[in-house]
């Protein structure tokens, strides 16, 4: 039975329509970020037209390819997304979200990532499934993201990992900036784990100085290690802090020891043995279960009985469902539940010795080596 043609759209229909029509508007987010429209609008500090925003933009950046018509449509759509306020007669005004985006540059780069690489992958999901007779789950470097490049005729990028593609397309520095602050965090890493009930202070203070070594695997620009050093300056020096990041655009990170380790290579074992802490923050959700087990097993093989592996990821629930989708489409990864973490640990020769799963934000999972 179909709904009457003249009946008003029910609330459920409005919800469906407003959600599924977001994608085209989200496609304009990279335009807003590229031309710094949020910063220009905030600088004006009062209701403004697209022409006003373009004038500020030219004052800041000189002559660019930003036209008034492109700025007007982009500002309008950003207003529709709630990123700024829409006023009558194509007039726009900064709001709290605008100010947040300007004050949190990493959030703008994150918005660009999910509406560039993420939106591209989502557009090719159904095509990838149909063309492979709905083969699922995806495997690393064989996701809708790579399939998009294959169908666009770029066979070289179609075989590359997302990070490699971003490097080749000049997008990796932007992504690295996103990872430094993401969409905002509560406090530092020590603050966050304390709030979840983890006794980091007791662990640090009860460990002999010669055994204090922290290894951050996939640690980006070293933010976590630097936060640890700031929390325990009397205990942690450069030689205690090891950053392992396989990323061509990271550069030199002061105050930590940088060490190359490409864990993707089958013959490449974890070079640091017996560290007190091995950390993986937002690393495993980029990996499939098989690849996650491989990485966990490599760490397990070098762990001492006193070693801990600390994992920080989003708690898998309704609040993280959208990032779960992004990990699937771009990386063949996923967010994980308590049961899924236990399964991964068991397959890798580890056991969970602490876990906390807040309803919002990052979960914390501590794993230790299973002793025979």
From Swiss-Prot:
Keyword tags: Methyltransferase, S-adenosyl-L-methionine, Transferase
Entry EC number(s): 2.1.1.-
Protein residues bound to S-adenosyl-L-methionine: 186
UniProt-listed InterPro entries: COMT-like, O_MeTrfase_dom, SAM-dependent_MTases_sf
Gene Ontology BP term (one): secondary metabolite biosynthetic process
Molecular functions (GO terms): O-methyltransferase activity
Top-level taxon in the UniProt lineage: Eukaryota
Listed pathway(s): Secondary metabolite biosynthesis
Record: active site: 285
Stored Pfam families: Methyltransf_2
PANTHER family (alphabetical): PUTATIVE (AFU_ORTHOLOGUE AFUA_4G14240)-RELATED, PUTATIVE (AFU_ORTHOLOGUE AFUA_4G14580)-RELATED
Family that this chain belongs to: Belongs to the class I-like SAM-binding methyltransferase superfamily. Cation-independent O-methyltransferase family.
Main function: Cytochrome P450 monooxygenase; part of the gene cluster that mediates the biosynthesis of bifonsecin B, a dimeric gamma-naphthopyrone. The first step in the biosynthesis of bifonsecin B is the production of gamma-naphthopyrone precursor YWA1 by the non-reducing polyketide synthase albA, via condensation of one acetyl-CoA starter unit with 6 malonyl-CoA units.
The name this protein goes by in its record: O-methyltransferase bfoE
Organism annotation: Aspergillus brasiliensis (strain CBS 101740 / IMI 381727 / IBT 21946)
């Amino acid at each position: 039975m179909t709904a009457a043609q003249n009946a008003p759209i029910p609330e459920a229909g409005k919800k469906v329509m407003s959600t599924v029509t977001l994608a085209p508007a989200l496609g304009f987010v990279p335009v807003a970020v590229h031309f710094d429209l949020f910063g220009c609008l905030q600088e004006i500090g009062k209701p403004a037209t697209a022409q006003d925003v373009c004038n500020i933009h030219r004052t800041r950046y000189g002559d660019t390819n930003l036209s008034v018509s492109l700025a007007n449509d982009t500002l309008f759509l950003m207003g529709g997304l709630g990123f700024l306020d829409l006023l009558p007669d194509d007039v726009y005004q900064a709001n709290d979200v605008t100010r947040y985006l300007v004050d949190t540059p990493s959030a703008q780069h994150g918005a660009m990532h999910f509406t560039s690489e993420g939106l591209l992958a989502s557009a090719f999901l159904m095509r990838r499934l149909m063309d492979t007779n709905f083969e699922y789950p995806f495997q690393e470097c064989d996701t809708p993201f790579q399939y998009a490049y294959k169908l666009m005729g770029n066979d070289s990028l179609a075989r590359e990992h997302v990070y490699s593609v971003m490097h080749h397309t000049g997008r990796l520095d932007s992504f690295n900036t996103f990872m430094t602050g993401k969409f905002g965090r509560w406090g530092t890493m020590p603050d966050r784990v304390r709030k979840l009930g983890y006794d980091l202070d007791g662990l640090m203070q009860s460990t002999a100085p010669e055994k204090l070594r922290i290894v951050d695997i996939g640690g980006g620009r070293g933010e976590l290690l630097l936060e640890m050093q700031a929390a325990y300056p009397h205990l942690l020096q450069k030689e205690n802090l090891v950053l392992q990041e396989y990323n061509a655009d990271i550069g030199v990170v002061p105050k930590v020891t940088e060490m190359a380790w490409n864990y993707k290579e089958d013959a490449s074992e974890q070079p640091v043995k017996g560290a007190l802490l091995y950390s993986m923050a937002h690393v495993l959700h980029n990996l499939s279960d098989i690849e996650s087990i491989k990485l966990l097993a490599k760490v397990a093989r070098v762990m001492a009985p006193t070693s801990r592996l600390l994992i920080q990821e989003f708690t898998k629930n309704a609040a993280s469902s959208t990032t779960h989708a992004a990990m699937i489409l771009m990386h063949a990864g996923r967010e994980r539940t308590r049961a899924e973490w236990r399964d991964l640990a068991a397959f890798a020769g580890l056991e969970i010795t602490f876990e906390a799963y807040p309803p919002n934000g990052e979960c914390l999972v501590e794993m230790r080596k299973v002793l025979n």
